Swiss-Prot record:
SMART domains: JmjC. GO terms for cellular component: cytoplasm; nucleoplasm; nucleus. GO terms for molecular function: chromatin binding; histone H3K36 demethylase activity; histone H3K36me/H3K36me2 demethylase activity; metal ion binding; peptidyl-arginine 3-dioxygenase activity. Disruption phenotype: Viable. Adults have circadian rhythms with reduced period length and increased rhythm power. Adults also display increased daytime activity and reduced daytime sleep. It catalyses: L-arginyl-[protein] + 2-oxoglutarate + O2 = (3R)-3-hydroxy-L-arginyl-[protein] + succinate + CO2. Fe cation binds at residues 306, 308, 385. Binds 1 Fe(2+) ion per subunit. Bifunctional enzyme that acts both as an endopeptidase and 2-oxoglutarate-dependent monooxygenase. May be involved in regulation of behavior and circadian rhythms. PROSITE patterns: JMJC. This is Jumonji C domain-containing protein 5. It comes from Drosophila melanogaster. The gene is JMJD5. Expressed in neurons close to the dorsal lateral neurons involved in circadian rhythm.
């Protein structure tokens, strides 16, 4: 047991803090107190009962995993997600007591990813980062995937753009012409300094930095379709299937890493980008944090016509995307879904309009453009947008209020 591991145990929450989280949860109270006491005694030289306590912690993880997967994720009680997250962290410690082999660290890394993706780690961010660093140290598991291609930079093409374009606008110009005017705008030459523009073309770089991490992947034509589903998969497997040198099997599903907080999960990738200064402009007295999302997939990924409630800056790193916009004033003419969970999504297919089924769509003024590498598209809140990738594509979006 190395000294660094013992130092990590110091970051585990004290029982007095956990007690407030699990108040009223009898099973979780018993197991987490036992686990916390065991690891506290470990620092004093005691190590009895580790196997039984570790088993109970694993059972607590499994029980709350089942609760999280019952019903819609948005309706899972926060306490369930917190218990799941901290139980995962304790499970990692007990697994590391058994072994710190590369394979064991890889298994622990997967558990930590699921704690972030399914649980709520906000109260234990310092512990999360320290565990990431410890598990990534010395490289968890050698990547056995076949080498991936390095993508060729796309040659910029002349394309029709139905909205204004601004070349590297100043903050003042952006605030006046875009933000305050509520005007969707294509911004040119604003992220040319990002290392991501050239580093991420080498898919082996992404494989090396993030290949062992687990992420949620969308499977199916788009999230509003009946056959759509999600799975948690290793990035290395996703990259191999969707970008590998071997031709894809006929009929293979398109997979999409969409709307994922990848940069919070893998800080090394965040070093390759930066939050554009435009995101500092706000109507709020105390602007909140900027939400940064990753969008990575092959040609043919589709986000159906939908809107977001926040200001949105969509930045294209590689590949290109065909985008169709519509104003908030046309909301009723776009036939939003009745479902609570799809209320911000239109029933129409913006790429293949069907005026017989949806006659009001004839009233809609659509705006089309091609988003190319290095471009940023500013979309004000509640502007509808349809997005389809024309080539293998990596985009980063910034949402703010």
């Amino acid at each position: 047991m190395d000294s660094e591991f013992l130092e990590l145990t110091q970051l585990l929450p004290r029982w007095v803090d956990l007690e407030n989280v699990v108040r009223g949860e009898v099973e979780a109270r018993y197991i987490l107190k036992r686990a916390a006491d065991h690891l506290a005694n470990l620092r004093s030289g005691g190590d009895s009962g580790a196997e039984e306590t570790g088993y109970l912690v694993g059972a607590l993880v499994d029980r709350n995993w089942e609760r999280i997967h019952t019903g819609h994720f948005s309706q899972v009680p926060l306490v369930t997600r917190k218990i799941y997250a901290i139980a995962c962290c304790f499970k990692i410690f007990f697994l590391l007591l058994e072994s710190t082999s590369p394979a064991q660290k890889d298994a622990c890394s997967e558990i930590l990813d699921e704690a972030q993706l399914l649980g709520c780690m906000e109260d234990w961010s310092e512990l999360k980062v320290a565990l990431m660093d410890y598990l990534d140290k010395d490289g968890a598991v050698a990547l056995n995937s076949a080498p991936l291609p390095t993508l060729e930079p796309l040659t910029r093409v002349t394309s029709n753009c139905d909205i204004p374009q601004l070349d590297a606008p100043s903050l003042e110009e952006f605030q006046t012409k875009c933000f305050e005017a509520g005007q969707p705008t294509l911004l040119l030459n604003t992220i040319q300094h990002w290392p991501a523009l050239h580093k991420w073309l080498d898919l082996n770089y992404l494989l090396q930095v993030a290949g062992n991490r687990t992420v949620p992947i969308e499977i199916g034509s788009n999230y509003a379709s009946d056959e759509w589903s999600q799975q948690l998969v290793k990035i290395r497997d996703f990259l191999s299937r969707q970008f590998g040198k071997e031709p894809s099997k006929a009929g293979q599903n398109i997979e999409y890493l969409a709307q994922h907080e990848l940069f919070a999960q893998i800080p090394a990738l965040k070093e390759d980008i930066s939050i554009p200064d435009y995101c500092t402009i706000s109507n709020e007295d105390t602007p909140g944090a900027v939400d940064i999302k990753a969008w990575l997939g092959p040609a043919g990924t589709v986000s159906p016509m939908h809107y977001d409630p926040k200001h949105n800056l969509l930045c294209q790193v590689f590949g290109s995307k065909r985008i169709i916009l519509a104003a908030p004033a046309d909301t009723d003419n776009l036939y939003p879904h009745d479902s609570e969970f799809l209320a911000n999504t239109a029933r129409i297919d913006a790429a293949q309009l069907d005026p017989e089924t949806y006659p009001l769509v004839a009233k809609v003024k659509f705006y089309q453009l091609l988003l190319q590498p290095g471009d940023c598209l500013y979309m004000p809140p509640k502007w509808w947008h349809y997005v389809r990738s024309e080539a293998p594509s990596f985009s980063v979006s910034f949402w703010w209020e």
